[in-house]
Design a protein with these regions (language model features):
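Two-component/phosphorelay signaling modules centered on CheY-like receiver
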Residues: 18-36
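Alpha-helical interaction/dimerization surfaces of two-component signaling modules
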Residues: 26-28, 47, 73
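Conserved acidic carboxylate
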Residues: 15
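Acidic, metal-coordinating helix/loop segments flanking the phosphotransfer/catalytic sites
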Residues: 37-55
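A Lys-centered signature of the CheY-like receiver
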Residues: 102
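Non-catalytic signal-transmission and effector/linker regions of two-component phosphorelay proteins
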Residues: 1-12, 93-94, 105-128
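Conserved phosphotransfer microenvironments
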Residues: 58-75
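Hydrophobic/aromatic residues positioned on beta-strands within the core alpha/beta folds
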Residues: 84-85
Length: 128
C-alpha cells in the first residue's frame, strides 16, 4: 500500500499541542488525506460520531484526560489508531495499536497508518 491509498481518506488527529498537530496534519494532507483535528477527547468523540475516520493519530494524554476510554470506543467501532505519545509506560495501551514515541517525524506516522490499513485490507482468495 502506498501513500496514494490515503487520498481522500479521513484521518483524525487527536493532539493538544498546536504545532505538533499542524505538523502531523500537513504530513497527511501532503499525501491527499482529509484531516480532522481534535484537541480534547470530548471533541474527538464528536468527530468519530460524525464521520468514521480511516484511522486516528492519538496522543495518550489530552487536555481532558487520558486515552483509555477513547481507545475503548475506537476498538468498539473497529477504527485503527496509532498511539503517538511521549509516555514510555502505557500499561497495555498499545496492545491493539502501533506506538510511535514522541518526538517523531510525521512521515513515520503516515507510514504507520499505511501499515495499519494494509493489515486491515481484505484478502481475496481465488480457488482455481
Amino acid at each position: 500500500m502506498n501513500s496514494a491509498s490515503l487520498v481522500g481518506r479521513s484521518i483524525l488527529v487527536c493532539e493538544d499541542e498546536p504545532l505538533i498537530a499542524l505538523s502531523i496534519a500537513n504530513a497527511f494532507a501532503d499525501v491527499g488525506a482529509q484531516i480532522v483535528t481534535a484537541r480534547s477527547f470530548a471533541s474527538a468523540l464528536i468527530a468519530v460520531e460524525n464521520e468514521v475516520p480511516a484511522a486516528v493519530i492519538l496522543d495518550h494524554a489530552l487536555s481532558d484526560g487520558e486515552s483509555s476510554q477513547f481507545r475503548k470506543r475506537l476498538k468498539q467501532r473497529n477504527i485503527p489508531y496509532v498511539l503517538h505519545s511521549g509516555y514510555s509506560n502505557l500499561d497495555g495501551a498499545c496492545s491493539n495499536a502501533v506506538h510511535v514515541p514522541k518526538p517523531a517525524n510525521p512521515d513515520v506516522l503516515v507510514t504507520a497508518v499505511l501499515g495499519l490499513l494494509q493489515r486491515r485490507r481484505p484478502t481475496l482468495h481465488l480457488n482455481l
